[in-house]
Amino acid sequence: DVRIVLPRKSNQRLADFARGAYLREMEDAGCKVLLWQPGMIHAKAGLIDDVAFVGSANFDVRSMLLNFEVDLFVYDVRSVATLESWFLDLLPDCKAGVPRASFIRRLAEGVFRLGAPVL
């Protein structure tokens, strides 16, 4: 079960626009994309089986090679359970699925993909 929770709208309009094609690819691969409706959420955290990670790193080249951001991996059972509970609390305010995109939108997103590594 692979799920990703993102804000429906972030504070970065260009990044919101550029992410559409990637999110649809993730859905096509079987990932459940959940868009959190209430507002901005800037958390960078995840759960993989019984391991959690939290930190400042975005999942992009800039964060890994230019900004030298870092994540903390957490193995403590109670801490992992707390993070899992937080994720589950977000779900009622999420809408599943990436909206369909028109041909023009998909074309524009393709152009934005060229610059995505530096957004």
Q: Which role fits each region the language model picked out?
A:
Residues 1-119:
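PLD/PLD-like phosphodiesterase catalytic module centered on the HKD motif
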